[in-house]
Amino acid sequence: MNLVNYYSKCLIATFITYLTLASTPIVESGLVRFIPTLSLIVFFLFGIISFKSGRYARMGTIVTLFAFWILICAVIHPSIEGSKIMTLLKSTYWCWIYFIAYTIFVNRNDNKAKMDKIVMITTVLFALSFNYSHMYRVVDLELIGDNTVFYPLLLMPWIACVLNSSKRWIMVAILALCAITALKRSGIIILSTTALILYYCDFLYRKRLQFKTVFMAIMVMLGVFAVFQFKADTIGNIGQRFKLLEDDGGNGRDMLYEDVINRYQNSDLIHQVFGNGFDAVKGKNTMMAVSAHNDFLEVLYDFGAIGFFFYLLIHLSLIKWMICLFRVRSQLAFPVLISYVCFLVMSLVSHLILYPTYFGLLTAFWAYAECKDNELKKISIQ
């Protein structure tokens, strides 16, 4: 048993604790403020240890090459944060999480009851953390939303794997309240799309038109009615934000995209191929000191054509895997589809690459789902 498996419980607890506290004011004072940095260091070290087994995962080669390229970029390019070490730790965090998760789950018998309990507890913790941090944020709800909602929302693939459908939908309801409170258009899109996929999977795809199906449909409608009654003002604000898309260009995203594309086209061939460094879009020589709000553009600008190629390979690898899962009617097909919807929506209108805590939830899920898929294949052969 290697160190990763030996300390697996501690690593999982540290990961959940880090993500629970990351968005709260708690980490801004006292000794607690060192938790994010310590967590990044711990996962970096254990990620290197788990590399030997993690590289054999489905996306192991792609993630390995991408991680290696990110490390090179962190070394050769100046850091936007002023610390190359912190840039290195943050930019590669999701890679190490993928390797660690694969190493933990690859040789472990799946205890579904225990795993479901962890997912349920994590959902509650993330929801409480979001609401706590939301109360302390000065947010103009008519103009912007709360990004911390993505912590609970990116649990949707994990929730889709929970065996008990009633518990699944209770957790979805919890996430729905968070999404409505946050006023994030992308959050509403993720929740709506993934919830519809999950409902189709649970009650239509499997053709189970039973009392439970009808009861759940009624409960969903009652839940929607209740939300409209008690969150009428918030829902009105969300509707207004969607109406403003044409006028504000997605909070100025159209202007931002144009600026990033122009800067990339006007840069020399070396920077176009090798990039400008992690989070370089919001550098000094820009009309707006913000990131690209689109991972395709961000990766292209930060890591160049080489990094963009690796990023596209991740998308293609996931799409190919989904097709294979649906062909064999695997129970993991819809959870993996839900994970890709989260990945795609966030990549198109927001960020995952720049926020390691967000992306870590998805890469950990992909590693877990692959190990579970391999386990199901062995059972079917036997």
Say what each PLM segment does:
Residues 94-137, 143-202:
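Alpha-helical transmembrane segments of multi-pass inner-membrane proteins
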Residues 44-54, 101-110, 159-166, 196-207, ...:
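Structural signal for the C-terminal ends of transmembrane alpha-helices
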Residues 1-72, 110-113, 161-166, 324, ...:
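Transmembrane signal-anchor hairpin modules in multi-pass inner-membrane enzymes, especially those
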Residues 181, 199-244, 264-266:
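A membrane-periplasm/extracellular boundary helix in multi-pass inner-membrane enzymes
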Residues 4-7, 53-55, 305-344:
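Hydrophobic transmembrane alpha-helices and their immediate junctions
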Residues 247-303:
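Long extracytoplasmic/lumenal interhelical loops at the membrane interface
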Residues 337-346, 353-382:
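Transmembrane alpha-helices of multi-pass inner-membrane enzymes
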Residues 33-42, 59-74, 80-104, 123, ...:
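Aromatic-anchored transmembrane helix interface
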